[in-house]
Amino acid sequence: MINEIQIAAFNAAYAKTVDSDAMEQWPTFFTKDCHYRVTNVDNHAEGLAAGIVWADSQDMLTDRISALREANIYERHRYRHILGLPSIQSGDATQASASTPFMVLRIMHTGETEVFASGEYLDKFTTIDGKLRLQERIAVCDSTVTDTLMALPL
């Protein structure tokens, strides 16, 4: 049975990967046919499928990181994730649906730090070769206002 401790450890590793700028590893947290979306609470409540960020495969996530490294121009910054404990809604030995509250601080190259996003991850986990992977992650942001500088994944 997939449990909260496994999911909390997974989320900690996920956050560390993003926060330490090991972005090339980020897509490996997902299945090949994953779904990743960043949306806001109002759009999610209304069932609107479009998101601020939307990807439907691990390859799309890899392309996003390639663009981040090679093509996009943005002000240098980094994130620090603060995560709550996960809550499992359903699950068995190989799959689980869970939600986890998050807050992401953005630290600019100048040292200025601000709350960038807060909300909850709505996740569908599966196991592949005994390791947890995200089949789906929807990052539902509390605010309907999104900074245009969402270069890094939440």
From Swiss-Prot:
One Gene Ontology molecular-function label: terephthalate 1,2-dioxygenase activity
Enzyme class per UniProt: oxidoreductase
Domain of life: Bacteria
Gene Ontology biological-process entries: phthalate metabolic process
EC id: 1.14.12.15
Record's keyword terms, sorted: Dioxygenase, NAD, Oxidoreductase
Subunit text: Heterotetramer composed of 2 alpha (TphA2I and TphA2II) and 2 beta (TphA3I and TphA3II) subunits. Part of a multicomponent enzyme system composed of a reductase (TphA1I or TphA1II) and a two-subunit oxygenase component (TphA2I or TphA2II and TphA3I or TphA3II).
Job description of the protein: Component of the terephthalate 1,2-dioxygenase multicomponent enzyme system which catalyzes the dioxygenation of terephthalate (TER/TPA) to 1,2-dihydroxy-3,5-cyclohexadiene-1,4-dicarboxylic acid (DCD). It can also use 2,5-dicarboxypyridine (PDC) and 1,4-napthalenedicarboxylic acid (NDC) as substrates, and preferentially uses NADPH which is the physiological electron donor.
Family: Belongs to the bacterial ring-hydroxylating dioxygenase beta subunit family.
Protein name: Terephthalate 1,2-dioxygenase, terminal oxygenase component subunit beta 1
Organism expressing this protein natively: Comamonas sp
